[in-house]
Design a protein with these regions (language model features):
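Conserved oxyanion/phosphate-binding beta-strand-loop segments in alpha/beta enzyme cores
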Residues: 260-296
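Aromatic-rich carbohydrate-recognition surfaces in CAZymes
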Residues: 138-139, 160-163, 234-236, 300, ...
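Terminal accessory carbohydrate-recognition/targeting modules of carbohydrate-active enzymes
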Residues: 1-267, 297, 319, 331, ...
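Active-site-adjacent bridging/hinge elements
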Residues: 209-216, 276-289, 329-339
Length: 384
C-alpha cells in the first residue's frame, strides 16, 4: 500500500494540490521540483535543474516543463497547467487527473474520455538526466501524444524575459532534438524511446507567474521559449519514455535504464521510508568526494550543518558507508583550513570556530552506534 497517494478530489482542488510540492534529485546536484499537479509555483521549479561548474556550480533551470496533449479523433486534450498574468490558470490539465501516487516514483494517472494514461518520472542516479514514462493503460481509438518542451536556460534564482539573443537552432538527433539557447550553457538533449515526428514552431510564451514568489514579494513573472513540439502515436498497453539530459543517449537503452533505476528505489510504504528517501536526496557526490546539502532548492553545503545533521542523515538509516565518505570529505576540508587558512570551494562556512566541536560530536555518535574501538581506529588521528 502506498503511503503517499492523493485522489481526484484533492488533485482538482488547486487550493489543496498547489501547496504540495515534490522534489527529485540525482545525488549529483541536479534536481526536479514542482507541485503534484506539475504547475511550477516558484522560479526555482523545473523539470531539469542542473549545477553548471563553469558558472560557479550554481543551479540553472534547463527544461522548465514538458506540456503534454492527448489527441483522439483530431480533438486535443491538454494535460499541462500554468499560471499566467492576472492569475489565469491554463490549460487546466489538472481536471483530467484521477490519482497521484508516489510509492517508488511519482505517478500521475489521467483520464480523458475513454483514455487512461499514466505518467511516471525518475531521475538517473549521478547523471544529469530525467526520464518520464508514459503508458497508455486504456484507449478505444487511435491515440497520439503531443509534447511541447518549455525551455528556460537561466539561473534558478533569476527570471527570463523574451529576447532576440537566444540561439534558435534546434538540430535533430536520434529520436529527438537538442538545444543550447545561450553561449556558455551545455547542450540539452531531448529524446524518446520511440521515433517521434518533430515540428519546429518557435514561440515565446509570455507572462508565466510564480505564486510563491508573488507571496514573498519578489519578482515573479517571466517569459519562456517553446521551440516546437513532438508527436508520437501510442497504442493501448504501450509505454513511451522521454529523456532530457546533458548528453545524448541511445533510445534503445532508455527502457533498460528506467527499469534498472526503479529497482534501486526505496518504496514509500511507511513514514520511516519517506524520511529515508527525503534525506538521501540531500546526498551529493562529486567524483571521489561526498557532501551533505542543507536542502533544495536554496541549500548549500555548510560545514556546521553537515556535522550536526550527519549522524541523523546516515547512521539513523543504516548508511554507515555514507557517513564515512561524507565525514572524510568534511574532515579533509577542515584540516586544510586549520593548516593553511584556505577556504573550501564547496563546503561553506568551514572557518566557523565551533566546527571542530561539532565534528567531534558527530564522531561520538559514530562511536556510540558502532564501537569506540572502531571509531578510534578510524578517526583518532584526525582529532588529536
Amino acid at each position: 500500500m502506498s503511503y503517499l497517494k492523493f485522489d481526484k478530489n484533492l488533485m482538482i482542488n488547486l487550493e489543496q494540490s498547489l501547496p504540495k510540492e515534490m522534489l527529485r534529485t540525482n545525488q549529483a546536484g541536479a534536481y526536479h521540483c514542482t507541485t503534484i499537479v506539475d504547475c511550477n509555483t516558484r522560479k526555482q521549479h523545473g523539470l531539469l535543474v542542473v549545477p553548471i561548474p563553469e558558472m560557479g556550480n550554481s543551479w540553472h533551470v534547463m527544461l522548465s516543463s514538458l506540456d503534454e496533449t492527448v489527441y483522439q479523433h483530431g480533438a486535443p486534450f491538454n494535460l499541462g497547467l500554468h499560471r499566467y498574468s492576472g492569475g489565469v490558470m491554463s490549460p487546466n490539465g489538472h481536471k483530467y487527473i484521477r490519482e497521484f501516487d508516489c510509492e517508488s516514483v511519482p505517478r500521475t494517472t489521467y483520464r480523458v474520455g475513454g483514455v487512461i494514461l499514466t505518467k511516471e518520472k525518475i531521475f538517473i542516479s549521478n547523471e544529469n538526466r530525467i526520464l518520464i514514462r508514459y503508458t497508455l493503460v486504456e484507449a478505444h481509438s487511435a491515440t497520439t501524444l503531443r509534447f511541447r518542451p518549455v525551455l528556460a536556460f537561466r539561473e534558478a534564482n533569476e527570471l527570463c524575459i523574451a529576447n532576440d539573443t537566444l540561439n534558435t537552432e534546434i538540430p535533430e538527433i536520434d529520436n529527438g532534438v537538442s538545444a543550447c539557447l545561450y553561449k556558455g550553457y551545455p547542450r540539452l538533449f531531448m529524446q524518446f524511446s520511440h521515433k517521434p515526428s518533430w515540428t519546429y514552431d518557435p514561440h515565446w510564451y509570455n507572462g508565466f507567474e510564480y505564486v510563491k514568489d508573488l507571496e514573498r514579494g519578489v519578482p515573479y513573472t517571466e517569459d519562456l521559449w517553446v521551440p516546437g513540439y513532438f508527436e508520437v502515436p501510442i497504442k493501448k498497453g504501450e509505454s513511451i519514455i522521454f529523456s532530457a539530459g546533458l548528453s545524448e543517449v541511445s533510445p534503445r537503452s532508455l527502457a533498460r535504464m528506467y527499469e534498472k533505476e526503479i529497482a534501486q528505489r526505496t518504496c514509500r510504504t511507511s513514514f520511516f521510508n519517506c524520511l529515508k528517501n527525503a534525506v538521501k536526496q540531500c546526498y551529493l557526490k562529486d567524483h571521489e568526494s561526498m557532501y551533505l546539502l542543507s536542502g533544495y532548492p536554496w541549500g548549500k553545503t555548510l560545514a556546521r550543518n553537515t556535522f550536526m545533521a550527519l549522524p541523523g542523515a546516515t547512521i539513523a538509516i543504516n548508511h554507515r558507508e555514507d557517513f564515512e565518505k561524507i565525514m572524510s570529505t568534511a574532515l579533509k576540508a577542515l584540516r586544510n583550513f586549520m593548516k593553511t587558512g584556505e577556504l573550501d570551494r564547496r563546503i561553506m562556512g568551514i572557518d566557523l570556530p565551533d566546527n571542530p566541536l561539532w565534528a567531534v560530536w558527530a564522531l561520538q555518535q559514530y562511536a556510540k552506534a558502532y564501537s569506540r574501538e572502531e571509531a578510534s581506529a578510524k578517526y583518532l588521528s584526525d582529532i588529536r
